[in-house]
């Protein structure tokens, strides 16, 4: 793409050098620390005289496949709604997730599975790494179109560390239950990205306003991402829950919640839409809020009715957020939320955390029976009451918001370093800044500027 020679040279070197450095450093750390766990290592597995059918691979890998498809296909295509940013939406999703899953294997490994001087990995490590990558991609949605790939890799480098620490504090130190990640994934990823976007605020972004919308075919491709996410979300929430009734219940609650959020979204979209017409932005995003809102409580005894009610509420709140709150977020709070992650992940994530507080507080031995140990082991052991568990669930939400806000602020300062390449204000949401785009897709209105204006450089 045309531009100053120094800027083009910086772009040519910055991404390759950063990719090579990050991959090289990760490879060295893998060589030193990462080993197969006892369910993956040939010698250790067969030493135990186990049947191959008992290996956790056969129980967990189907869920991993679904989660993997959500991360790379669902999230990637959900963000292709921008008319001139499809290559970047899918391509940078691919890049970020590929790095994040490696880096998070190390970070989470040091925190959760570090024994005898090594990190031990298996299929559950893959699922956890994909969960972390999902949080990074949620944050990416808030700054979509306004950042370069080198900036995004540095964002992931920081966010993965903070994600791992926050998850460790909630799940291991506080004993919070969050099977589907309403707090650890959605709330953390959303508010990390929103604070990051606030720090990177661009007052002259109006110069790229004409590229910020969608066209017919870009919305259609984005709907592919929605359908992938919608279909596989029960697997996402249940991927790491206790096998048996717990996993079964988690998938069922998510299934009903998604269905109800879809109907709520269609209803509200037509109600608030111009001339009673549906808005594809609402359908693409708010219909998924049902999966987010039951992330914390889906393994609990939420009841099918509770799942339907939660999903419907999430769908309506998310739709209203896209219609009314997103413009306020930009005009009053100076948060330029490209994908509306506050509406799809932020608000439903907080609602999901609060729903978890309520359902945890109602937990009794009569309701759960012997299953109480797999959902609330500390209550089953008599180490805490249901009320104490509920209070710690609420405190976990506060801790998550704190980590996300501080981390997003630090990330914003890091990404504002002047030597990092980012698109100028006049060329945001434009693939040709970072990609070779086929010539037939150019027209006079979309052809890149020959000379970049100094006053629009980020």
Swiss-Prot record:
Composition-biased stretches (Basic and acidic residues): 444-458
Topology of this chain in the membrane: Multi-pass membrane protein
Sequence segments annotated as region (Disordered): 439-458
Glycan-bearing residues: 49
Sorted UniProt keywords: Ammonia transport, Cell membrane, Glycoprotein, Membrane, Transmembrane, Transmembrane helix, Transport
Record keyword Disulfide bond present: no
Entry GO CC: basolateral plasma membrane; plasma membrane; spectrin-associated cytoskeleton
Annotated compartments: Cell membrane; Basolateral cell membrane
Family annotation (PANTHER family): AMMONIUM TRANSPORTER, AMMONIUM TRANSPORTER RH TYPE B
Protein name: Ammonium transporter Rh type B
Naturally occurring in which organism (per UniProt): Macaca mulatta
